[in-house]
Amino acid sequence: MKLANATWMNDVQIQAQALASAQIEADAVVVFGTKAEFENASGFPGAGACAAAVRSGLFEAECCKAYVVATGEEKAPVLIAVGRKEEALTEKQLRLSLAEAARVAVKHRLSRVAVIVPEQLVEADAAAAQSFAHMMVEGFLLGAYQRVTYKKDAKPAHTFASLNLYAAELATEAWNEGIKTGQAYALGTTYARDLTNLPGNVLVPSTLAEQALELAEQFGLEAHVLDEKQIEEKGMGGLLGVGKGSVNPPRMIVLKYQGTDEWTDVYGIVGKGITFDTGGISLKRAANMDEMICDMGGAAAMLGTMSVIGRLRPQKNVICVIASAENMPAGNALKPGDVITSYSGRTIEVLNTDAEGRLVLADGMTYAKELGASKLIDAATLTGAVGVALGSITTGVVTNDDAFYDTFKAAASRTNELVWQLPSNQEYWDMLKSDVADLRNAIPGGAGTITAGLFVGTFADELPWIHLDIAGTAFLASSRGVDPKGGTGVMVRTIAETILS
């Protein structure tokens, strides 16, 4: 299974160095400046060429845009000039600037990159310096992402040997800690992107389980996987029902990280892992059905989060549950009108087999509770309705606990991942009632994102719970900001930040 960034991003050497004592050895040097600063540039390799380029109008030093400047000097590094405004760089601008610089370096296949840290960041206190180092490394690695292709003559992905941050003054411990966390967050996100981008004939529930087991082995996590027989024996009717129409049987995947002596205060993170979604008997339209390779984006987000946790090894407890199936039409597939029994014992009237994500999540949520979760976050490409409401820019949120959401929202603010809370009034909960079962899985009319989320939340029972509908944000038609076309790995950084903070 080809995962584009699994190797080189682990191997790239990243460090911070004091500028005064350093001999810069690089294929590319990244510098920041306003137009006026570049016009009078000095003190870095290629400064004269940079000044001449700006004066002649070759580039305008637009904020967060990266420009290649030919120095004209033999064996000299390529200069990548990144524009900025007069005001101090924000964390969002810093991430994006480094992502743009990385994309330029990938395009020109430059392997050793040096970044001259702006004075504003050098003068920061230790806490701010750690944050800035985090943003720079994270932004660079997110921008360096390259999707695997399956072309006969495809070039191998460009790899980076080193990324060095050069600062006039250096709070070494703070910078090193920021580098460590920034790299971990980026690696978790790019891992999730890789999984999301895999074709549906490559990634099926069993191979997703294999990926999870490999991740567990890499980071020393506890893991177990339930196969279809065990799923049936346990009475996980939601997951079993969705998966029974496919020749690729379902899997319930569990990863456990215990960072404290006692198994208490446990974050339960639950991901929807539909490796391909045809809609089942309630068949989707053919247009854009190929994008349903991303219907396991919630599972990818949670595995990416466990990658971050495994690297940073915080004093936290986390149980990750992935409910994985392939939703296919067949003679034995789930049908509209069927009534199934979930792992919780609640019965569900299936009105639409294309509302399958909430069925598998129902069992995943109950299993996470059984395994000790004391608070729950689920992520799923759950509804098309969230894209109508929020587009591909913002992740929709439904919750039963405003205090828990406030913590999560603060984390999202720090990671610059946009989220928006939707209402959860009792009237919406009432819409889930069925005449023939405890719940129905589809509701006619509007409020589809809200009611789908609340369906999942039913299985949280009394626990604090946050639902993330990433159907609009998990897979993009074109690149935007630090996110590439295709799988984005959305919410990895925010979920990890919530747990770590």
Explain the meaning of each model-derived region:
Residues 1-8, 15, 87, 209-501:
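A generic structural signal for tightly packed, nonpolar segments enriched in small/aliphatic residues
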Residues 1-266, 270-273:
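Short amphipathic alpha-helical segment within the helicase RecA-like ATPase core
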